[in-house]
Structure formats: structure tokens, C-alpha cells
């Protein structure tokens, strides 16, 4: 009885497998013999057949001319439709993913269609970064920001859990959240996106207007590397105008190094810091800590005016009319941290005595403290603040004068310097007349890459000695490390003066190292080896 078509097909399949095995057997035995000659190698007992080789072998075993021949022989040709995966385009903020599929063969010679972005981004980091803020494969969403200003952000639990122990506990811990939408009202959307971008790609993009919010987000989710980057960014952008605000934030975030850097700026540039807009935005505990500060380099009259400005702003924040009574109320004990008796009598009479924030009894007692032999007890500290002690970097080993003494002729004496630690340049020490007492008019300048940072036009009197005489800038100027700055002095007065000799290219002053080099601005002969500008006066 003839076999059914299905049986014939089955027999053909078995025959084909047997023939294939017999064809491959001699070649396999040869390989085994060759492998036995090399005992260090593992014997290979399999062969991977490529698709083209399979087709050629089948053609040799079963030569078929066309489709009609197959039909006559009774064989069934199965045509399996190729499965195609429809990939929807992804809406994405930061990157677009090309989703046109490409076909490749895997190790089993199966055709596999893959999205083109896999091959276009060969590294794991690139592919991971592509998923940032991307709906594709997202398994969680965050509603970030306060109501009315929130933003929906897609994310991937695994990526976040790997980068943050907080997210790991949130998604995979014992108290894992099952909600697909997680609300985070206390984080700004821009800061949250910066956090996520770092977690997906190791890229950090910080800006002055978002760095504090980013630091908060990094602290909240314990992403320490990003938090350190934020602190470093804040330290490099720290200035007198933002020092008080950053001090307040550093105390909130418990960042002691940043707090110390803020204090350095506030102490050295106290007047600029207290008169900045940011000072009125600080909280009361930070205000009190500033008023407790012994090292503020500022007049007490400036401190008092700054306190009044803060009280006015605080009244408005609390919805109060800024009357003297309300100002006194919001200040509380902070008012009694102002050292009113340390002002001069003239400063007190022209300022604090004419402001109603003090009671009549307080004003009367302070006037008596100034004038009476028996001092009344006061509710205010009476000792002036110590301030900072200025340091001097002297760059010459000796000074001299001869018949051809140094001459001031209205020309520019200039020198360049750099430091290895941030300092605040307060002024210059200059040589005076070698012929007795003399008065000089002087203009001093501080520049960086040709940009004027500070200048002052003033006078000083020399006594005929070889001592240096200080000339101050209006405010100390912050000087960053590892950058060259130029200081200049133009003097008019007695022509003959002392001059420095045996100049040093490097000088160690406490914990700060100064380097000096000649300046092209110098037209009066001053250089590294000799000339004028013997001293830099600074705070560190």
C-alpha cells in the first residue's frame, strides 16, 4: 500500500537528516584527528551550518526545477508569513529614537528585526542615555512639582533603583510602591530631570538658577556624586552677592565645607554681602548667626542698616505692615545682637538714634554710655568686632635707594600674580619717598585678562623710611586660584623713592603660595626682579 503524502514527507525529512550526517561525518573525523595532535585544545564536535550551505546541500539532494514540479511530486510547500513588529514612534524631550527596523541573522540563522537605534548606539551608556525622559519601555511615571506647575516624567524602575538606594527601596523594597504614577510636589521639574539625566548617562548639567534645587533633589534621593558636584559648582560661583543665601542653604543641607566657604566670603567682603539683595532673603537663624560673627570686616552702622532692611522684607513676607513695632517684633533678640555702642557717636546720632525701632530708654542709655563717666548697663554688645587681620605678601628680599633712585613720573608700575588658594586682595603696599616726608596721589587697579575688577584713586603720605605704605581698594576683591591677575599703580608726587631688589618668583605666605611674573602693562621698569609694588595685602 503506497504511503500517505504526510509519511512520504516525513521519510524524506529523515532521509535528508541521515544524508546530511553522512556528508559531514568525514570532515568531522578529520577535525577530531587534528585536534588529538594538540592535547591542549578541546575537541570540536559540532559544525554551525550557514543558511547558504543548507540551501546548497538541499539543492544537491533534491534538485527541483520549479514550483510545478513540486506539485506533481505531491510535496507540500509551506509558506510561513514573516512576522513583523510594529514599533510606535516615541515622543521624547531630549532625544529622538529612530525606530525603522533592520533585519539581521542571529547565531541560529533566524532573521531578527531590531530597531535601528540599537546599532546606531553601540555602547551601553549611549543606549541607556537614550532612554532618559523616554516613554519607550517606561514602567513608572513621576508627577513632579507643585499642583498647577507639575510635569509628568517617564522613567524606568531598574535604572533608578541601580542609581539610588531610595528608589531601590521605593520599587523593590518591603514597602515598594505599586502605583504607576508617583507624585513629588517638593522637587522642581527642572531639577528632577537633571537628577534623572545623571542617573541614566552620568552627565551633569548644572546652572545657577537650578543648582540649589538640584542639590535638594540629590540629597533627597541620596545621589551623593551629584550632590558633591552641586556643592563644587556652588563653591566656584560663590560671591559676596550670593554668599548669605548660600550660607542659609548650606546650613539647611548640612554641608559644612560649603558653609565654611560662605563664611570666608562674608567675613572678608562683609559690606558687599550685607548690602546684597540676597541678605534680605535669609532666615532668622542665619541672620542671628551672622550678627554673632566676631570676624565681620565691616562698620557697625552698615550692619544696623542691613538688619533694618531684613526686618522690612520679613514683615512683607509675613503680610505685616513694615512699621517700627512690627520690625522690632520680627527681629526679636536679633536686634540686640547689633553692637550699637561700637559705632562712633556721630554714626549713632545720625543713624540708629533717629530710627523708631529703638525705645526712648534704649536711645537715652546709649547716649549716656558715650558721654557719661558712669556707664549705664545696656542690652547691646559694647565691644567692636575684631574683624579680619590683613596678611602681607612681600615679594622683595631687600630695598635700596641710590643716586639713580627710582622715579615716579606718572607712569604705570605693574606686576602679575597667581595664587594656589582663593584669597581676597584688599590693597597694595607701596614704597614712598627716599628724601623725607612726602604726599603721593595714586591710582591702583586690579585686572584679570584685561578686565578691570577694582580700582581706587587716593592719597598716602610717606615718612621718608624704606617701609611700605598701604593703599586700599574700596572693597576686598575675590581672587581665584590658578589664574593670573594684574595689579598696577600710577603715582604722582616726589619723584625719588625707594625700590625693591632681589625679587622672588614664588613666595609662601601662611597657607597661600604666590607666583609672580612680569606684566606688559608696566611702563616704569617694575618687574619680577625689582621695582615698585613690593606688597600685596590680602585676607585668606
UniProtKB/Swiss-Prot annotation:
One of its GO terms (biological process) is regulation of neurogenesis. Disruption phenotype: Morpholino knockdown of both isoform 1 and isoform 2 leads to a major decrease in the expression of neurog1 and downstream markers of neuronal differentiation. Knockdown of either isoform alone leads to a mild decrease in the expression of late markers of neurogenesis, but has no detectable effect on neurog1 expression. Signal peptide: none annotated. It holds the Pfam family BTB. CDD domains: BACK_BTBD3_like, BTB_POZ_BTBD6. The keyword rRNA processing does not apply. GO terms for cellular component: cytosol; nucleus. Residues 138-208 form the BTB domain. The keyword Nucleus applies. Expressed in the developing central nervous system. PROSITE patterns: BTB. Its main location: cytoplasm. Keywords: Cytoplasm, Developmental protein, Differentiation, Neurogenesis, Nucleus, Ubl conjugation pathway. It is found in: Cytoplasm; Nucleus. SUPFAM superfamilies: POZ domain. Adapter protein for the cul3 E3 ubiquitin-protein ligase complex. Promotes the export of zbtb16/plzf from the nucleus to the cytoplasm and targets zbtb16/plzf for ubiquitination and degradation. Up-regulates neurog1 expression and antagonizes zbtb16/plzf, to promote neurogenesis. Interacts with cul3. Interacts (via BTB domain) with zbtb16/plzf. PANTHER family: BTB/POZ DOMAIN-CONTAINING (PTHR45774), BTB_POZ DOMAIN-CONTAINING PROTEIN 6 (PTHR45774:SF5). This is BTB/POZ domain-containing protein 6-A. It comes from Danio rerio (Zebrafish).
Amino acid at each position: 500500500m503506497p504511503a500517505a503524502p504526510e509519511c512520504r514527507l516525513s521519510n524524506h525529512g529523515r532521509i535528508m537528516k541521515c544524508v546530511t550526517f553522512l556528508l559531514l561525518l568525514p570532515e568531522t573525523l578529520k577535525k577530531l584527528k587534528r585536534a588529538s595532535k594538540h592535547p591542549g585544545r578541546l575537541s570540536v564536535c559540532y559544525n554551525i551550518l550557514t543558511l547558504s550551505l543548507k540551501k546548497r546541500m538541499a539543492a544537491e539532494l533534491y534538485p527541483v526545477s520549479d514550483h510545478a514540479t513540486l506539485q506533481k511530486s505531491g510535496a507540500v510547500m509551506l509558506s510561513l508569513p514573516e512576522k513583523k513588529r510594529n514599533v510606535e514612534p516615541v515622543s521624547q524631550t531630549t532625544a529622538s529614537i529612530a525606530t525603522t527596523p533592520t533585519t539581521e541573522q542571529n547565531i541560529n540563522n533566524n532573521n531578527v528585526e531590531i530597531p535601528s537605534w540599537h546599532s546606531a548606539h553601540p555602547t551601553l551608556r549611549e543606549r541607556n542615555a537614550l532612554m532618559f525622559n523616554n516613554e519607550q519601555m517606561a514602567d513608572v511615571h513621576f508627577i513632579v512639582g507643585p499642583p498647577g506647575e507639575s510635569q509628568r516624567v517617564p522613567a524606568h524602575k531598574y535604572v533608578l533603583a541601580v542609581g539610588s538606594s531610595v528608589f531601590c527601596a521605593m520599587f523593590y523594597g518591603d514597602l515598594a510602591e505599586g502605583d504607576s504614577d508617583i507624585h513629588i510636589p517638593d522637587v522642581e521639574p527642572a531639577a528632577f530631570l537633571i537628577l534623572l539625566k545623571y542617573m541614566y548617562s552620568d552627565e551633569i548639567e548644572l546652572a545657577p538658577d537650578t543648582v540649589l534645587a538640584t542639590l535638594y533633589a540629590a540629597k533627597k534621593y541620596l545621589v551623593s556624586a551629584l550632590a558633591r558636584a552641586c556643592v563644587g559648582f556652588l563653591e566656584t560661583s560663590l560671591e559676596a552677592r550670593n554668599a548669605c543665601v548660600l550660607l542659609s542653604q548650606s546650613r539647611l543641607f548640612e554641608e559644612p565645607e560649603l558653609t565654611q566657604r560662605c563664611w570666608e566670603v562674608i567675613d572678608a567682603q562683609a559690606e558687599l554681602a550685607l548690602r546684597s539683595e540676597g541678605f534680605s532673603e535669609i532666615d532668622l537663624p542665619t541672620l542671628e548667626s551672622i550678627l554673632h560673627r566676631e570676624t565681620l570686616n565691616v562698620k557697625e552702622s552698615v550692619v544696623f542698616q542691613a538688619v533694618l532692611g531684613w526686618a522690612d522684607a520679613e514683615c512683607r513676607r509675613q503680610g505685616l505692615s513694615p512699621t517700627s513695632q512690627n520690625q522690632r517684633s520680627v527681629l526679636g533678640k536679633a536686634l540686640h545682637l547689633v553692637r550699637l555702642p561700637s559705632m562712633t557717636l556721630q554714626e549713632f546720632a545720625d543713624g540708629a538714634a533717629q530710627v523708631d525701632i529703638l525705645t526712648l530708654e534704649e536711645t537715652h542709655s546709649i547716649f549716656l554710655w558715650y558721654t557719661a563717666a558712669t556707664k549705664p548697663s545696656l542690652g547691646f554688645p559694647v565691644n567692636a568686632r575684631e574683624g579680619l587681620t590683613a596678611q602681607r605678601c612681600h615679594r622683595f628680599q631687600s630695598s635700596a635707594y641710590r643716586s639713580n633712585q627710582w622715579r615716579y613720573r606718572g607712569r604705570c608700575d605693574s606686576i602679575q600674580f597667581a595664587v594656589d588658594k582663593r584669597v581676597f586682595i584688599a590693597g597694595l603696599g607701596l614704597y614712598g619717598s627716599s628724601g623725607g616726608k612726602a604726599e603721593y596721589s595714586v591710582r591702583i587697579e586690579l585686572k584679570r585678562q584685561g578686565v578691570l575688577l577694582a580700582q581706587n584713586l587716593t592719597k598716602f603720605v610717606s615718612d621718608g623710611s624704606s617701609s611700605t605704605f598701604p593703599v586700599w581698594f574700596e572693597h576686598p576683591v575675590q581672587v581665584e586660584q590658578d589664574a593670573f591677575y594684574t595689579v598696577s599703580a600710577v603715582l604722582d608726587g616726589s619723584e625719588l623713592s625707594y625700590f625693591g631688589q632681589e625679587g622672588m618668583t614664588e613666595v609662601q605666605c601662611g597657607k597661600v603660595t604666590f607666583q609672580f611674573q612680569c606684566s606688559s602693562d608696566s611702563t616704569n621698569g617694575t618687574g619680577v626682579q625689582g621695582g615698585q609694588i613690593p606688597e600685596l595685602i590680602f585676607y585668606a
